[in-house]
């Protein structure tokens, strides 16, 4: 399927305990009543507003997309700007507070044409945070049981039942008890505990007391909380949901006071937008709104099992809500998630020609393993990416043969069978590849972040720690679908500082501030299961997207790219170099050797530099045999060389860079010939069958076609039937509409290993068989 949105461990001691039911009055003093006796708001941003407008109305203006953005960032504060074609929350805070007089905004385009007028919501209607709990009784919640019975759970057997996701064990005990009290300890512990749901639970309570060295996670409704050693947690079921004692305090948290707000539609958010804001007789204009590219993220997912079955733990791929949540953390206008069917490889061919059928003889690990690198990363992930670029074949080893012109990532779960057993791989990202173990949480945000060009601990404390409102690198997130702010601190009051490199950020009202995804951060709550990037990182991410092209069926070239000067998306020509070429050794520049190379390669290059130089370069006479051949000289050595060509001798000095093309009679000198060719998809965003594998142009290593991979969304290119000779290396694919022939490189890109191939064909064409051919010889055939 594809989803689019426009938007350390030790063995615990085993202990036995008795459980009993106490039919005696409960001491009221054990429980605390949390009432709504303090309704005063807690404001995050209490700084004095700074005027952003021109005119009689003075007001500070901010916008919120994936996070709150200042109209005019403070000096030295690296913040992202608005993303085109993404809806935005407009936040207006008058310098002179007035919460009563209505505020309107009039939007105009770069031609001063009115786009529309909106009346802003008053400060009393400012959206809540994701920590705000709905359904709380006006009088608050009294955490006192309705009657005097309780059940104590303190045996290993009973505690083990608590990991049931339905919460059935706790539910059964609550039927005849007002309170269930659960004691965890070393040897009597589970990682996850679930509270039950049901109308018969009204007024019931659950209390957790932990003396376990390991933390547990308590799940209640759509929320969760960590239970740590020494902690006590108290819950009560009210109005159809569980509430935890102490969490209602978060209902008081709000971004700032005196803020008027309205949602601006996505089609208004384009360069040239200006706003006229009116309050009573006052009016102010915001002209210089910086709006950047409508960036797009294309994310492929695939679950791979190498000599073992796939793990079936790619949670992100299965969860559309996870797609939506991650989209809310990045500055793009569109994100497409393309899920591939799981891939079970019962045998694995390596580029060396070694076929693995049982296990990889080497060891593997989270960050290691031959199959992890060669198959999961290079062949499958880059294979998916490169097939969408129309790049049919590349070097068999390494990650360098990847153009990365589009923000296109292939994320994979993979595990393999090695000499040290079945090993799960994860924890790496970059260059269009994401290798993941856990796909919900910071590992995902972190490894995808590497693909955006983010390193670890970007800019140290000043760039990697979320800050309070008066500091640089401060913001809140925004969920534009749920209409909720996401504070940059955790919901629990722990009074912890956030420190990095001997610098610390004090907590906000006891709440610890977060860290960036690239600096050991974590999601703030279950409301969004991904880590909020700091403004500093978000600005870098935005620059990444603004420097990438997008697939675009409406473009004459099949791609579009943001032009920062014109502030428009313009046609972008994606080119690849498929010319057969070689760089001649400086020790083999005789006429006969050069003639031999020219007979085999369309382009022969001579590149010299200090330490890699020879005096004479001999070129064969132009003839019908070498008509169309290209010779390119790049001379960077300090010593001169002599080029013998066209019956003449030519001095070649440092800095000389030219090409010669044979017309059959003469070598004609010209500027360096660009042999790259433009690639434009033939079909856009269609279900694809992706074919990958290895082939050896020399025919000495065993070529191999892997099982087909099936994706829901990809790009296909016309085949090369019109430009192929029978001797050319090619992949032939039989379909219901006939045979397709795709050109592959005729020479090894790496001297000692095979080349990779990676090609998309439309699934609709019903491909049935693939055949690898070189020099008119069949290398391998695969039924699809």
Task: Briefly describe each language-model feature range.
Residues 45-151, 241, 247-440, 452, ...:
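Propeptide-to-catalytic entry region of secreted or membrane-anchored zinc metalloproteases
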Residues 95-101, 210-214, 635-639, 724-727:
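Short proline/glycine-enriched turn/loop motifs at strand-loop junctions of beta-rich domains
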Residues 89-95, 207, 716-721:
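Short edge beta-strand/loop segments characteristic of extracellular beta-sandwich folds
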Residues 2-34:
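Gram-negative bacterial Sec-dependent N-terminal signal peptides
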Residues 444, 448-452:
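Active-site His/Glu-centered metal-binding helix of metallohydrolases
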Residues 228-232, 653-657:
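Tight coil/turn sites that cap or link beta-strands
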Residues 143-218, 243, 580-644, 662-669:
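Exposed extracellular interaction/assembly regions and N-terminal maturation sites
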